[in-house]
């Protein structure tokens, strides 16, 4: 399971590239073409799993150092999103969703698709179906296209709130 890419939504670095893939499109392309079974948790689903200042307020209300510090860090991230992605209304839980989906694949709905990453030109870093393997019966990548966001965010908040309550 990897966090990276954007299949049907705009990128977060350029209109077509997601930040993790954008760092090294050639390496990402090798991974997608490796014939390893992969699950791609991209912006299509991660930008639906949001934390808001209402969530961080719950951590502050715990009255613990951990709750206060993590609320500060997350609020900073939320404020950054107000500049870069104001339409979202919070900060996306990119990596936590990928980690949780690796443990509980039922969190996401996927489609099977052989993927590639464009490595040259204006679209370098774009994750897209590989037209040279479109008819291959063996499809190696499950690209997440939907997420049970309520269940994920509720579980995420419960785990962290319980942890922060202790410290």
Report each predicted region and the residues it spans.
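Conformational coupling and interaction surfaces
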Residues: 22, 26, 41-167
